Amino acid sequence: MEIRLADSKDKQKIIKYDNHIHHNKVGECIWNQLVYVLCDEKRIVGVLRYSLFWQSIPFLDLLYIDEDYRGKGYGRQMMEHWESVMRTMKYDYVMLSTQEDETAKYFYEKLGYRRIGAFLPPEQDADEIMYLKML
């Protein structure tokens, strides 16, 4: 398995997994080196996309692992890789959010993320929990 920065030829595969932003924005994120992919040989089986909250704080926007690869530690590997890169880039902490009713919150808490607040977006039925991790 390999974790690498996404490039333009990965765009269509990434769009398949990332329906949280408009497909035109995916190319922009790739260009700005904000997307990592997990590859099994040449096949993309995971995607991690982030942005900069307030243009200064790395914020995880998406972590997706193909269903056949879940529960095998690849999500943890992608998170650790991203955190390592952010540390190298001299960031002191990273942030993310997930819905209160999603099991992902337990995954992030096991990785050392701590809850720093929550809000209820009008389009959701559950609170969106904000997390922070010191690097």
Give residue spans per PLM region:
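A general lysine-centric signal
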Residues: 133-134
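Acetyl-CoA-dependent GNAT
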Residues: 1-61, 66, 85, 121
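A short, internal acetyl-CoA/4′-phosphopantetheine-binding micro-motif in the GNAT/acyltransferase core
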Residues: 63-70, 99
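Conserved active-site tyrosine of GNAT-family acetyltransferases
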Residues: 108-109, 113
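Conserved acetyl-CoA pyrophosphate-binding loop and the N-cap/start of the following alpha-helix
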Residues: 69, 73-81
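Conserved short alpha-helix immediately C-terminal to the canonical SAM/SAH-binding motif I
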Residues: 78, 102-104
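Conserved GNAT acetyl-CoA-binding A-motif
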Residues: 86-98
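Conserved catalytic-core motifs of GNAT/GCN5-like acyltransferases
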Residues: 95-97, 114-130
